[in-house]
Curated annotation (Swiss-Prot):
Family annotation (NCBIfam families): PRK05943.1 (NF004612)
GO BP annotations listed: translation
Function field: This is one of the proteins that binds to the 5S RNA in the ribosome where it forms part of the central protuberance.
Subunit field text: Part of the 50S ribosomal subunit; part of the 5S rRNA/L5/L18/L25 subcomplex. Contacts the 5S rRNA. Binds to the 5S rRNA independently of L5 and L18.
Source organism of the structure: Shewanella sediminis (strain HAW-EB3)
Gene Ontology terms, MF aspect: 5S rRNA binding; structural constituent of ribosome
Record-linked HAMAP family: Ribosomal_bL25
Name of the coding gene: rplY
Pfam families assigned to the protein according to its UniProt record, in alphabetical order: Ribosomal_L25p
Name of protein: Large ribosomal subunit protein bL25
C-alpha cells in the first residue's frame, strides 16, 4: 500500500521552533540522504498519526508532496513522546 502525505517546508529550524510546531499540533521532520540537500518539513499531527499505525508505513515507500512536488521517501526514524504517544519528530530518507 502506498501513502501520500502533504507537507510544508519549514523555514525556522532548531529546538525552539520545533517546540512551537508541536504546540500547534504539527510534526517537524527532515528528508535526507542520497547526496541531496536535506529538506526540513512539517506535517499536521492528525495527518500522520492514523497512517503510522499500519505496518506498511514503516516498510514501504511513501510519497510526500512538498510545494507541489512529489518526493519518494522511506521512514528512517521516529521519535515519540515518552508517555503521551505523540509523534515528536520523523526522519525520512530519499528512496
Amino acid at each position: 500500500m502506498s501513502y501520500t502525505i502533504a507537507a510544508e517546508i519549514r523555514t525556522e529550524i532548531g529546538k525552539g521552533s520545533s517546540r512551537r510546531l508541536r504546540h500547534a499540533n504539527k510534526v517537524p521532520a527532515v528528508i535526507y540522504g542520497a547526496g541531496k540537500e536535506p529538506i526540513s518539513i512539517k506535517f499536521d499531527h492528525k495527518d500522520i498519526i492514523n497512517i503510522q499505525e499500519n505496518a506498511d508505513f514503516y516498510s514501504s515507500d511513501l510519497t510526500i508532496t512538498v510545494d507541489g512536488k512529489d518526493v519518494k521517501v522511506r521512514v528512517q526514524a521516529m521519535q515519540r513522546h515518552a508517555f503521551k504517544g505523540l509523534i515528536e519528530h520523523i526522519d525520512f530518507k530519499f528512496a
